[in-house]
Amino acid sequence: TYDNRYIETLWWLLKQLYNKNLLYKGYTIQPYSPAAGTGLSSHELNQPGCYRDVKDTTVIGQFKMKNPKPEMAEWGTPYFIAWTTTPWTLPSNVALCVGPKIDYVAVQTYNAYSGEKMTVVLAKPLLNMHFNPKAAELALEDYKPGDKLVPFKVVGEYKGTDLVGMEYEQLLPWVKPVSVDEKGNWTDASAQAFRVIPGDYVTTEDGTGIVHIAPTFGADDAFVAKAAGIPSLYMNNKKGETRPMVDLTGKFYLMEELDENFLATCVNQELYKNYEGRWVKNAYDPQFTVDGKYDEKAAQAAESLDIFICLNMKADNKAFKIEKHVHNYPHCWRTDKPVLYYPLDSWFIRSTAAKDRMIELNKTINWKPESTGTGRFGKWLENLNDWNLSRSRYWGTPLPIWRSEEGEEICIGSVEELYNEIEKSIAAGFMTANPYKEMGFEPGVY
C-alpha cells in the first residue's frame, strides 16, 4: 500500500464491486483491537496463534424476577441465573436468552456465599453441574451457612417458551437503556428491556442454559435482541457520539467525557463513579506497556476489573458462583492483546452474495491434501461472513468513497477520475485549486 499504482488498482477493483452493489457501509458488531485502534476481519483472527487459552474470572449472576410463577416465589427470592466469562459486560445487560426447546427447572436452595434462601431457574441438563446430587436428599430447613453441601429441591419444570416474556430487575443499574428522538432528547427505554427472549443458539454444553445478553458487545446478542425489540445500552459523549459503555481505548467512559444532559438523565452517578475510567482488560492499561513492550505477566498478576465487579456482586448478593475458567479467546495479531467485540461503522464486501457459488466452485478444485478443501477452507466458506474492509490505520489504502451531508455518494475508481472530480468541484466553487495539477501530476504517469 506504499505504491500509488497498487492503491489505484484497488480503487478500480472496489469500484467494480460498488457498481455491482457488493460494497456497502454497515454498523455491526465486529472484532476490534483497542490496542491497535482498528477493527479486524475474520481472516485476521483465524491466523495461527490468534486464539489462545486464557484463564479468566467468571461469574453466575443472579437476575431477580419481577413476575415469577407461583412456585418460584414460595422459597426466598426468585432469580434467573446466567453465566458469563466477561463480567465487565454485565453492566450492559438488557435481556436474558433461553433455548425455546430446552427444558428448565426451578430449584429451591440457598446462596452459598450469603446463606440467603432463594429459588433459581436454570437448564435441567445442567442441574448436576451446579448442585451436588448428594445434597438432593437433604432437608432445606437443616442448612446452616458454611455447610459444604447446599440442599436443593426441584419445584417446577418448563420449556424455554414458558419463560419467554418474564421480566427481571436490572442487575447493575449504572446506566439506563435509552432511545433518542429526532430532536436528540433521551428517553428511558427500560420498559422494553430486562425480559427473557428466545434464541436458537443457546446450548446446554456449559453455563446455565440462560445467556446474558449485552447487544453492544456480541454479534449473536445484537441479533436476538433486535429480533425481540430489545434496546441496546449506549452512552452519549461530549463529541455527540453514541458509543457503548466502553470507549474505543477499552475503558469505561469517565463521567466528565459524557454529554451533560445524558449524564444527568441516564446515569446513576453514585454507582457509576466506582467504575468510571476502569480498563475492561488489564492489557489495555498503558501502565503495563513500557517503551512499546507489553508486560503480560504483570497485567495478569494485577487485579482485573472482572474480579472487582465479581467481588462487589458477591457483597451485594448478586453472585451465585464465582470461579476461574480457561477458555479460548481471540487476540490481535499486531499487538498480542485481546480483542473486544464492538459496534463499528465499517465498509463491507458482500461476500455472502457469492457464498453458494464459491462453495460450488470449491468442489471442483483438486485439493492436495483433499482435507484442506473439505476441511479448513470448506468450513470457512460454509460460515462465510461479509468481508470487513475498514481499518483505522494511516498506512492502509484510503477507501475511495465520497459522501455528502445529504447522503449523496460516489465511488472513485482511478486517480484520473479523482482528478476530474476535483476539476468539477473547482468549477462549482467548492474548491479553489487542484492539488494534483499544482504538483504537475498527470493521471496514469507515475
Placement of each model-derived feature along the sequence:
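Active-site periphery "cap/insert" segments of enzyme catalytic domains
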Residues: 2-16
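Short, solvent-exposed turn/loop segments enriched in Gly/Ser/Thr/Pro and often Arg
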Residues: 1-6, 28-35, 326-330
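Active-site cores that bind ATP or allylic diphosphates and position pyrophosphate for catalysis
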Residues: 31-81, 88-89
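Non-cofactor substrate-recognition interfaces
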Residues: 1, 73-80, 87-446
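Alpha-helical scaffold segments in soluble metabolic enzymes
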Residues: 12-16, 60, 64, 308, ...
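Gly/Thr-rich phosphate-binding loop signature of adenosyl cofactor/nucleotide-binding cores
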Residues: 21
